[in-house]
Amino acid sequence: MDFEEAEDINGIRFAWNAFPSTKVEAGKVVVPTGALYTPLKQREDLPIAAYDPIYCSNQSCKSILNPYCAVDPNGFWRCPLCQYRNPLPAHYHGLNPENLPLELQSTSSTIEYITARPVQNPPIFTFVIDLCQDEDNLQALIEDIIVSFNYLPPNALIGLITFGTMIQVHDLGSDKINKSYIFRGDKEYTDKQISEMLNRPISTQLMQQQQQQPGQMNPQLANSLTRFFLPLEDVEFQLTSILENLSKDPWAVANGARPLRSTGSALNIAVNLLGLTYPGFGARVMLFAAGPCTLNPGMIVGNQLKEPIRSHSDIDKDNAKHFKKATKLYENIAAKAVKNCHTVDIFAGCYDQIGMLEMKNLCNLTGGTLLLTDAFTTSIFKRSFLRLFNKDDEGYLLMGFNGNLEVRTSKELKISGLIGNASSLQVKSANVSENELGLGGSSSYRLCSTSPRHTYAVFFDVVNNQQLPPNAQSYIQFITHYQHSSGTYRVRVTTVSNFLTSDEQTLTNSFDQEAAAVLMARITLFKAEQDDGADVLRWVDRMLIRLCQKFADYRKDQQESFRLGPQFQLYPQFIYYLRRSQFLQVFNNSPDETAFYRHVLLVEDTNNSLIMIQPTLTSFTLDGEPEAVLLDSVSIKDDRILLLDTFFHILIFHGKTISQWRKANYQDLPEYSNFKELLEFPKKEAAELLHDRYPLPRFIDTEEGGSQARFLYSKLNPSVTYNTNDFIGGGGAGGGAIVLTDDVSLQVFMSHLQKLVVSGSS
């Protein structure tokens, strides 16, 4: 079975599909023993059991019955992780290979249990809308929010908060008039203050009236915080009316000033109010922001336009005066959301930065969406926002709420940590390693929200010190508890087994260079959040050199003898493109753009992450089939159309000759129908790529000499530049385009790598 087939079945990709057998050997392989796991990966033939799982009785294990368990005729099963002998339930007695229960069948390495415990509340959605924006942008946003009601379950609880200079919490339980409560935008309210201001006691007299007048609104709704979150089917008309009557914030904006925007206080109120009302139940706070917060708490920039918003350089030099204070506020709000299992989504609809860098942990720790768009009027926002509410074949939302991921291992392994959109629950079980990588010190992680897209990097420590027999196996079990949008609690269980080997050839053959590159990219991003950028790049280079010294074939000090086997051949170029990517080279990006790009890489699976690291390039010509070509400047030819997929952008580039023919409208002439077809091919291919991608990529149609061709040139390996010999000698015209850059080419990078490897340097 190849790596992608295994991923299709279990949603998991390992860097090493066989593990080093001892701690010493594991320390020499450079790339950590890790896995990329997608708990809710969609699978048509997923085994589903409509009963509760059977757990191992060993309190320090608590793994779940799975196909790797040995079952004896006396009604016992042996746990492969801890070797504990457990009694089977009475109705499982007398098992044989022909009548195995679902969870013991070989096809059930991944299985989902629908437990008997019902969810007490439906999912909750709170819309937090910025009113400091122009009318067109605001109206487009309101239209999309109203459309989204068609995608939500009718019993979903809905809340609404709007903000500008002041904050309005809308009371949806008031059926006669539209009622809202006003809060100051420049004050940080505690949950106690919010409760005292909004939560009125239920009077005995009112309760008696309720009993005498059946059919009237429940006093619980009229007099408690639950009146701010009501079923969509009950309040849709009123909510739509409120939204349609929203208008731009009336607070005057002086010349040379930014609007007074209270994003920080509005988010604080939304998260606290949900925490007071529905702690421990699936909920999303959806922020729609059209500019930076200009009021404390949470100020990103002052309201005077003469004060520029912070840049990467300002942050690096500690010149961003609001940065640390704002970051601390949003981290505190994120901690409250995590405690209550609530998710925060942030949608930006403006050219301005809104403060995503400061707010990123609101999404990164809660599994929320971070989406950067130029305006709420764009199709990128509209289609991406509505895709968040995609449904499965049964009509249920493809999102899991209020989840947690538990990782169980056999005795040879311990958990080093996790990197992804989750938060640690600090469960220090016996299988937790002292060597932390990412969010360490725990075997259990909170997933406030998860989906079929959410992928988590989990790292392991090989702790075995003894020589093992041939074909010794280790076992890992991932247990994901979550609240399904159908109103049930579910448990998704994936159990996998890996050989432990001391044979270097077996280890080499088990190496998945694609998964390894993505895992190393995640570690690199984790380091980039804490360390200096130059130090991170040096670390990346050292790791690559050490890996090649361990697994390449070469003779000392003979560069031409350097060879990498097929399992490692692509890995150096993945690292080359990672070094050049927007994830690490932040010079041309704002802090908000960097936060957005990094957030998406921490969510996606192996294939999508690889596209972000090393984009794909496809060539279309008149006399051949579409083919993948090198991501290199030599691939640009006059008679070619190129399709570039960077995940965030889909770009169609027309070569010089193709562009001239297109401008001459040859495609409109009957005798050039083949040229018309050529122009359509890449558009069809692009449409397929756009179909399921989240967030929706920006589509660019450009040509040789076009201003937006820079998006293509910036991604290409500059094998021909303005200062190479080819260019100086007049070459390059037939051998690709000239790239005006001082960046090192892949060929030079590989030459330096080989030189350092064979010299024994690190």
Curated annotation (Swiss-Prot):
GO terms for cellular component: COPII vesicle coat; endoplasmic reticulum exit site; endoplasmic reticulum membrane; Golgi membrane. The keyword Coiled coil does not apply. Zn(2+) binds at C56, C61, C79, C82. It comes from the Eukaryota. InterPro entries: ADF-H/Gelsolin-like_dom_sf (IPR029006), Gelsolin-like_dom (IPR007123), Gelsolin-like_dom_sf (IPR036180), Sec23 (IPR037364), Sec23/24_helical_dom (IPR006900), Sec23/24_helical_dom_sf (IPR036175), Sec23/24_trunk_dom (IPR006896), Sec23_24_beta_S (IPR012990). It holds the Pfam family Sec23_trunk. It is a peripheral membrane protein. Its main location: cytoplasm. Keywords: Cytoplasm, Cytoplasmic vesicle, Endoplasmic reticulum, ER-Golgi transport, Golgi apparatus, Membrane, Metal-binding, Protein transport, Transport, Zinc. It is found in: Cytoplasm; Cytoplasmic vesicle, COPII-coated vesicle membrane; Endoplasmic reticulum membrane; Golgi apparatus membrane. One of its GO terms (molecular function) is zinc ion binding. GO terms for biological process: COPII-coated vesicle cargo loading; intracellular protein transport; positive regulation of ER to Golgi vesicle-mediated transport; positive regulation of protein exit from endoplasmic reticulum; regulation of COPII vesicle coating; reticulophagy. Transmembrane segments: none annotated. PANTHER family: PROTEIN TRANSPORT PROTEIN SEC23. Belongs to the SEC23/SEC24 family. SEC23 subfamily. Component of the coat protein complex II (COPII) which promotes the formation of transport vesicles from the endoplasmic reticulum (ER). The coat has two main functions, the physical deformation of the endoplasmic reticulum membrane into vesicles and the selection of cargo molecules. The COPII coat is composed of at least 5 proteins: the SEC23/24 complex, the SEC13/31 complex, and the protein SAR1. This is Protein transport protein SEC23.
